[in-house]
Curated annotation (Swiss-Prot):
This is Uncharacterized protein L613. It comes from Acanthamoeba polyphaga mimivirus. It comes from the Viruses.
Amino acid sequence: MLSDIGQNSTIIYSKLSKNFWIMLDLMENILSHCEKHEITVWLDYSTYYLVMNNPIGITSHEINFGIDHIDRNRFISIFESKIDSKISLYHLSNNKITLCNGTTIVDILMYNKIDSYYQQIDSVGEKIYAPLVRKLFIGHSIWVSHRWISDSMNLITREFSIGFSKSIPRHHCETFESIRKLIENSCIPVIIETDYLDLEQSDYEKLINNQKRNIYGYQSSITWKQSESDAITTWKNYKQRKLDFNIVDSPIDDKSVLPSEWNTYVKDKLGNNYDFALTWIMTIKPKITHFHTDPEYAGGYMKLLSGEKIWWCICPNDYQYLVDRGHSIDTMAKLNFNEVLQLENNYLIGRIYMDIIRDGDLIWFPINTLHKVITTKDSYGFGGYL
């Protein structure tokens, strides 16, 4: 079982073959590029069953992804324009694309949408029944048939990532007191379902109009080079999809949207850093913020009013474990999922927290949480420290 594998990762995963990691890297490349270019991609049932129950076996089985045939040419152009000598288009036909990474190959099978299901082209094989449900697998978006996860008799209804990573726990909080107790007793990231900081776009725009200071952000999460502009221009560029920098830590002048008990709490907790209790969030997709940690004012949070982001989090104790063994943000910043799993004899397998946050979700994480964020939909909202 995947959950058992995750619990004993230091024993079972420490001896994984080179071919396993080559295959996992190829699979992650497929998923990340489909994610970036908004191509819906799924696994056929046999592959889905394999990765859910025995991921170690991926090197000895045929791995098949599926996409709608209308996305075929766009999928091909992605890899033809990608500067990566490790991956090549090994075979092309009307019903299949084969990608090669050294000695490892993966097939992308073409499907036609017919009424309520997808049928593989030139095949009488299984049908993939719509609607498809989005999940996370090895840190990226993948789609599965709703039938596979709604059938209580199905033995593979567990979460995809179990064994490789963990889902970020979700909590429903109706009062600030419940939020306070949650974060003060948590050493892991949490997603909080709450009405706090909910705001209509028209009211968000009032905050924009009241903003006197420029709004700043970064162009790259490697160099952290900053850009800034006045609030009206920044918001206009965001809505027109012309915003060319990512905004997360720029303080909001008007903090009246903070509930009184929240405001009192952060004034005491943040002290001279109170200005960062409420900050702007604006990001245009697709965007990757590489692994980093935030200033140690307090735990960080992000409340999405609209949009979607995938979060990868490495908890403070696990991050410190890596630092103590010579790793740093500089060496880890650009690592993909496949690479970060292999650090220190696969230490992080089963330890990385991952999830998707969407409209209305609030994510909070402790000080010194190493995190990476993938923006899959244009997103705006609030951030800050709590």
